[in-house]
């Protein structure tokens, strides 16, 4: 799956425009389209907009929590930003996210400068699980996540 992200994110970053295109791209890259993927896309698009970055213009440092069910958020962020392991712009940290966070992602401009720290709280997981359980359609999942507030926190990265 990670190899697919490396290959596809280089060529298709930010080319998806509709919920249908995002869901199709996410499913093709990740192998499915649960609610974690569109949350990653939402974070990636938010960071790209706030940091005024184009495709492949950001670096990501991803802190996973082994208590979270998966690190699928990383695939969504990679899809939205064009970051990849192969380009050395996506790194999964050896250290873990704190216990109260499913993931922490530090996103910075590739050329340097101030970045952003995104935290996905463990408290968001039941909401994401409910979206997956209640909505079988990937496009409906995408739209539900994009409309939802409070699924992540964002602050300036130190």
List where the protein language model places each region.
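Non-transmembrane, aqueous-exposed alpha-helical and coiled segments at domain scale
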Residues: 16-33, 42-158
């Amino acid at each position: 799956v990670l190899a697919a992200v490396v290959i596809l994110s280089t060529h298709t970053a930010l080319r998806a425009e509709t919920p249908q295109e995002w869901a199709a791209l996410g499913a093709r890259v990740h192998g499915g389209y649960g609610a974690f993927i569109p949350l990653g896309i939402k974070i990636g698009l938010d960071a790209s907009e706030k940091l005024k970055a184009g495709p492949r213009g950001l670096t990501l440092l991803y802190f996973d929590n082994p208590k979270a069910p998966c690190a699928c958020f990383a695939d969504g962020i990679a899809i939205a930003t064009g970051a990849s392991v192969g380009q050395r712009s996506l790194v999964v940290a050896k250290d873990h996210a704190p216990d109260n966070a499913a993931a922490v992602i530090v996103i910075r401009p590739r050329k340097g400068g101030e970045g952003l720290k995104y935290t996905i709280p463990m408290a968001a997981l039941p909401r994401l699980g409910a979206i997956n359980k209640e909505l079988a359609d990937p496009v409906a999942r995408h739209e539900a996540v994009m409309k939802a507030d409070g699924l992540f926190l964002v602050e300036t990265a130190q």
